[in-house]
């Protein structure tokens, strides 16, 4: 899916999964996305059902995604997030 949005173009290359559901039909998704025909990046953000509208999110390069995975891989998230 390649969609122009103003000056912004995006293509969801692969949906890796949904990590949360909103109350208005939006879902927080982890996707591999190409922005403006550039190299694909890992993307975490809210999307509406048709992927025509999006919320603010986080986009990570391959190096950043690997560093993030390493950072949280050893955490006990239940303990860390209970603070």
Where are these regions (language model features)?
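Positively charged, low-complexity terminal tracts
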Residues: 1-83
